[in-house]
């Protein structure tokens, strides 16, 4: 097949595994990566000759078609197709980055939490495969599947509890929930309302808006007070913006009449994250500064990195939180807890308590799932 890869090529490549690559997010994300990652390759980097995309999906016919289609694109990024028929092992072997958009999509009336039981089972199985096939001391795992608030705890807890080889690997520093779409939406919506209201002229730049907390409803805290985009929004406009960011996913589901969810914008957000990790692992940059949903404690129940010990009391001991991080090739190296100290009164006294209360329930749901799965196995 034209989209298979020889072992000798794989040895010299940076391998990215996309699990769920034939789905709505997976196809678009794979297209962006195939088309754009060539620009990360630099002539000065001789240790990696090229980038390889290993595309996996349970739908063999669909993933073979997607991979064949992508393989015709004129970039030096290689692609290979994988399904249960050939085994997920070939997809994950030697992968440096594993991206997971796998799972069932949202339908009308469904919240991210409604998806939990089905997607938690999928994430657990994929986590088992990652633990068995990947180098846990090096691999980065980016979880896109929803509900992120619960599924990242499922992934981390399942690997640490059920795979003894993970205990000293530091893998918990390299499993991250992708919440970038909330940041993308906050930036887009803020620029839009400022222009429509005549508060700012139309410019070809986008505002930076930090978004912390979780990735569902009121666990999402857009910090418009810390945006670099000067604004004179009134209270009603601000409330509208916050609600729109928190429930932007519902807006897309309704617009598609329940026949789809936010796939294109999520693929764009996912690409923006993956390209940073590719740049890091190629040596183009020394560290990443970005917001991800991560555990705040390591496998031994100590703070995951400097800054986590200061953040934990600020979020009432929540074990997972989306927060700006510094990330090196070893994983999370610093947690920017001070962003919470810089919140205004409304964000700190109204939004944060609601976020933390709901987030703890979401986290417990994930941990309970793993505990019950372990007990029944």
UniProtKB/Swiss-Prot annotation:
Residue numbers covered by motif Pro/N-degron: 2-5
Modification after translation: Targeted for proteasomal degradation when cells are shifted to glucose-containing growth medium.
Modified residues (Phosphothreonine): 6
Protein induction: By acetate as carbon source in the growth medium. Is inactivated by addition of glucose (catabolite inactivation).
Residue sites binding NAD(+) per the record: 20-26, 57, 119, 144-146, 266
A single GO BP: malate metabolic process
Active-site residues per Swiss-Prot or TrEMBL entry: 215 (proton acceptor)
Subcellular localization, as worded in the UniProt entry: Cytoplasm
Residues binding substrate, per UniProt: 106, 112, 146, 185
Documented EC number(s): 1.1.1.37
UniProt keyword list: Cytoplasm, NAD, Oxidoreductase, Phosphoprotein, Tricarboxylic acid cycle
Location, primary (coarse class): cytoplasm
GO MF annotations, alphabetized: L-malate dehydrogenase (NAD+) activity
GO cellular component, one term: nuclear periphery
Enzyme class: oxidoreductase
Pfam families reported for this sequence: Ldh_1_C, Ldh_1_N
Catalytic activity line of the entry: (S)-malate + NAD(+) = oxaloacetate + NADH + H(+)
Cited InterPro entries: L-lactate/malate_DH, Lactate/malate_DH_C, Lactate/malate_DH_N, Lactate_DH/Glyco_Ohase_4_C, Malate_DH_AS, Malate_DH_type1, NAD(P)-bd_dom_sf
Quaternary state and interactors: Homodimer.
Comment field (misc): Yeast contains at least 3 malate dehydrogenase isoenzymes: a mitochondrial (MDH1), a cytoplasmic (MDH2) and a peroxisomal (MDH3).
Record text about domains: The Pro/N-degron targets the protein for proteasomal degradation when cells are shifted to glucose-containing growth medium.
Record function comment: The isoenzyme MDH2 may function primarily in the glyoxylate cycle.
Family in the record: Belongs to the LDH/MDH superfamily. MDH type 1 family.
Name of the featured protein: Malate dehydrogenase, cytoplasmic
Originating organism: Saccharomyces cerevisiae (strain ATCC 204508 / S288c)
Organism lineage string: Eukaryota, Fungi, Dikarya, Ascomycota, Saccharomycotina
């Amino acid at each position: 097949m034209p989209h298979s890869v020889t072992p000798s090529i794989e040895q010299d490549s940076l391998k990215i595994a996309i699990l769920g690559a034939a789905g709505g997010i997976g196809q678009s994300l794979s297209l962006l990566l195939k088309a754009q990652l060539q620009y990360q390759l630099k002539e000065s980097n001789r240790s990696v000759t090229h980038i390889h995309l290993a595309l996996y999906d349970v739908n063999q016919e669909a993933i073979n078609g997607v991979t064949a289609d992508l393989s015709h694109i004129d970039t030096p990024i290689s692609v290979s197709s994988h399904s249960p028929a050939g085994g997920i092992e070939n997809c994950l072997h030697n992968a440096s980055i594993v991206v997971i958009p796998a799972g069932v999509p949202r339908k009308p009336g469904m919240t991210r939490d409604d998806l939990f039981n089905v997607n938690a089972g999928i994430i657990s199985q994929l986590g088992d495969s990652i633990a068995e096939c990947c180098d846990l001391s090096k691999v980065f795992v980016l979880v896109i599947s929803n509900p992120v608030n619960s599924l990242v705890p499922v992934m981390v807890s399942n690997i640490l509890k059920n795979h003894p080889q993970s205990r000293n690997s530091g893998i918990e520093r390299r499993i991250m929930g992708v919440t970038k779409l909330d940041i993308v939406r906050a930036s887009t919506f803020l620029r839009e309302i400022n222009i429509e209201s005549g508060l700012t002229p139309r410019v070809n730049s986008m505002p930076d808006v930090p978004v912390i907390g979780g990735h569902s409803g009121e666990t999402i805290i857009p910090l418009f007070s810390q945006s670099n985009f000067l604004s004179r929004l009134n209270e009603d406009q601000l409330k509208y913006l916050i609600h729109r960011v928190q429930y932007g996913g519902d807006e897309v589901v309704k617009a598609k009449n329940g026949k789809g969810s936010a796939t294109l914008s999520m693929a764009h957000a996912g690409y923006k994250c993956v390209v940073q990790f590719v740049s890091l692992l190629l040596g183009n940059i020394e560290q990443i500064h970005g917001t991800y949903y991560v555990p705040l404690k390591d496998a031994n129940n100590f703070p995951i990195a400097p800054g986590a010990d200061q953040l934990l009391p600020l979020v009432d001991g929540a074990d997972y939180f989306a927060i700006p991080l510094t990330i090196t090739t070893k994983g999370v190296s610093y947690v920017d807890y001070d962003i919470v100290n810089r919140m205004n009164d409304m964000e700190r006294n109204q939004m944060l308590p609601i976020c933390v209360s709901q987030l703890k329930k979401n986290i417990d749901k994930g941990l309970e799932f793993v505990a019950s799965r372990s007990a029944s196995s």
